[in-house]
Curated annotation (Swiss-Prot):
One of its GO terms (molecular function) is imidazoleglycerol-phosphate dehydratase activity. Gene3D superfamilies: Imidazole glycerol phosphate dehydratase, domain 1. It comes from Streptococcus mutans serotype c (strain ATCC 700610 / UA159). It is an enzyme of class 4 (lyase). CDD domains: IGPD. Belongs to the imidazoleglycerol-phosphate dehydratase family. This is Imidazoleglycerol-phosphate dehydratase. It comes from the Bacteria. It is found in: Cytoplasm.
Length: 194
């Protein structure tokens, strides 16, 4: 089974995270940041993976450290669970509509970290969640998985729908990329490693 457990403890956050790419249950997200819990649940469900997160952060300051550190821990867990990446598709792309919004995620589990984030939010907040943290999360995730991740809102108005389409699209693209393809012998790279 492709799975991992990560514990990350700093002066700002304490995070326990477990991930299994080969089963879909359980999904249980408890970060103390309601909107973020909702987004991570969508990410896991649409990525068809088990994800359990328990985070205690300095929410009396704001949710920045919690969101970023969960992104770091999730990225580390994905990298660990993927191991040598033998037989995986490597690439994944997904377009996800959410009412008036259309979001896209395209990624490469190349071992090279890069994020292109082309999404604008009309308001700085979604409830008590800072919309700038959407990009912060994906930055931490991409750099710790060591993947190229391109995210784009092609069109849309509602900020909730924009964020939701990006989290769902990333989960779906990741599912495509991590799927083991029997047609791929070894690692899907002319270098012989990812």
């Amino acid at each position: 089974m492709r799975q991992a457990k990560i514990e990350r403890n700093t002066f700002e956050t304490k995070i326990k995270l477990s991930l299994n790419l080969d089963t879909q249950e359980p999904v249980d997200i408890q970060t103390g940041v309601g909107f973020f819990d909702h987004m991570l649940t969508l990410f896991a469900r649409h990525g068809r993976m088990s994800l359990v997160v328990k985070a205690d952060g300095d929410l009396h300051v704001d949710s920045h450290h919690t969101v970023e550190d969960v992104g770091i821990a999730l990225g580390q867990a994905l990298r660990q669970a993927l191991g040598d990446k033998v037989g995986i598709n490597r690439y994944g792309t997904s377009f996800v509509p959410m009412d008036e919004t259309l979001g896209m995620a395209s990624l490469d589990l190349s071992g090279r970290s890069y994020l292109v984030f082309d999404a604008e939010f009309d308001n700085p907040k979604l409830g008590n969640f800072d919309t700038e943290l959407v990009e912060e999360f994906f930055q931490a995730l991409a750099f710790n998985v060591q993947m190229n991740l391109h995210l784009k809102i092609l069109h849309g108005k509602n900020n909730h729908h924009k964020a939701e389409s990006l989290f769902k699209a990333t989960g779906r693209a990741l599912r495509e990329a991590v799927t083991i393809n029997p047609e791929i012998k070894g690692v899907n790279s002319t270098k012989g490693m990812l």
